[in-house]
């Protein structure tokens, strides 16, 4: 399987609830997603529309990590700068003036992955992590035609600057129209969109989408793997040497890592374990993971095996619940 990650690039600054300010540093949804997969395999490429100053920021990182440039498309002038402000509960939002929001909304369109870019990488042995807003139903109708004709596997992470119930109708329409192979939301997004803080109710709503694999992220607590009418909660995973520094991008990295785990194993628990391990690497510094190597990959696979064995020992009923997935 060949893997791809599509989203945005940005230079980020974070302000935490205690007033600590860090940055600027390299970020972006597409790059974080790429990192979540690259932890596990070198067979992954970013699919990005980039700015003319992109290599001024990312050039050294790309060279040192031998990142495939084939699908980097020059599309606009200046890389986005994003200012994220976190609350104590982990919720964050980007802070802009009204004029900045208007300007960014116009320019942001240049960063989104295009249908022709997707068509170029689509195939039965290809998988795409895509960060894209729940907007533009025509895009999703055309995308489904490409996906169905090619056999491309898709993990859709809906993109939100601020999520609220106003997105519910179009989100549900896209879910019905496109029917992604895999998808993900975090707790804040799901709660805001569906108007409830009841986790059981949120899970029932998500299960009604009938997505084959859904990665429901619950922040520092961990994530649910929802598949085949079953649900498995996998706590967040600490990776030795990557103590918690900054959660920015962990949703992107973990969702993309979970996609890799699901497609490689067909096991929802292992997929969530691998996703959470990708997040565990991502949280260990400000910005994107600086360096990928064989030692990291060996550490990741060893950690996955260790955590998976422990989870099955702690949850003896899971072995039987997982049988339908492991027989495929």
PLM segments and residue spans:
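Alpha-helix C-terminal capping segments
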Residues: 35-43, 261-264
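A short acidic, amphipathic alpha-helical/loop segment
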Residues: 58, 138-146, 170, 201, ...
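Conserved N-terminal subdomain of the carbohydrate kinase-like
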Residues: 3, 11-24, 41-129, 151, ...
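Conserved phosphate/ATP/ADP-binding segment of small-molecule kinases
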Residues: 148-153, 160-235
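Short, hydrophobic/glycine-enriched beta-strand segments
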Residues: 1-10, 155-157
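Glycosyltransferases and closely related glycan-assembly transferases
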Residues: 123, 140-153
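Short catalytic helix/loop segments, enriched in acidic residues and glycine
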Residues: 19-35
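Conserved phosphate-binding/catalytic region of the ribokinase-like
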Residues: 198-328
């Amino acid at each position: 399987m060949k893997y791809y990650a599509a989203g945005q690039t940005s230079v980020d600054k974070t302000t935490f609830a205690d007033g600590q300010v860090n940055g600027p540093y390299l970020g972006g949804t597409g790059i974080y997603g790429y990192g979540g997969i690259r932890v596990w395999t070198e067979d992954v490429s970013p699919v990005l529309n980039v700015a003319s100053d992109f290599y001024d920021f990312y050039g050294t990182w790309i060279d040192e990590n031998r990142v495939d440039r084939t699908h980097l498309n020059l599309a606009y002038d200046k890389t986005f700068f994003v200012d994220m402000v976190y609350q104590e509960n982990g919720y964050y939002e980007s802070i802009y003036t009204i004029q900045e929001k208007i300007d960014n909304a116009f320019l942001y369109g240049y960063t989104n992955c295009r249908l022709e870019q997707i068509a170029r990488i689509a195939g039965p042995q290809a998988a795409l992590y895509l960060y894209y807003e729940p907007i533009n139903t025509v895009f999703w109708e055309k995308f489904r035609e490409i996906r169905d004709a090619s056999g491309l596997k898709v993990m859709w992470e809906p993109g939100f600057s601020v999520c609220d119930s106003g997105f519910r109708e179009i989100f549900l329409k896209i879910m019905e129209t496109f029917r992604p192979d895999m998808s993900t939301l975090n707790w804040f997004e799901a709660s805001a969109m569906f108007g409830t803080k009841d986790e059981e109710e949120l899970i029932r709503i998500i299960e009604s989408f009938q997505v084959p694999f859904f990665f429901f992220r619950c922040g520092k607590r961990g994530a649910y793997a929802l598949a085949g009418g079953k649900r498995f909660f996998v706590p967040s995973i600490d990776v030795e040497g990557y103590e918690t520094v900054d959660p920015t991008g962990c949703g992107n990295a973990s969702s993309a890592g979970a996609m890799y785990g699901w497609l490689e194993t067909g096991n929802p628990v292992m997929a969530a374990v691998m996703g959470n391990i990708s997040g565990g690497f991502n949280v260990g510094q400000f910005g994107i993971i600086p360096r990928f190597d064989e030692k990291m990959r060996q550490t990741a696979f060893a950690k996955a095996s260790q955590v998976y064995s422990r989870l099955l020992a702690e949850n003896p009923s899971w072995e039987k619940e997982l049988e339908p997935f492991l027989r495929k």
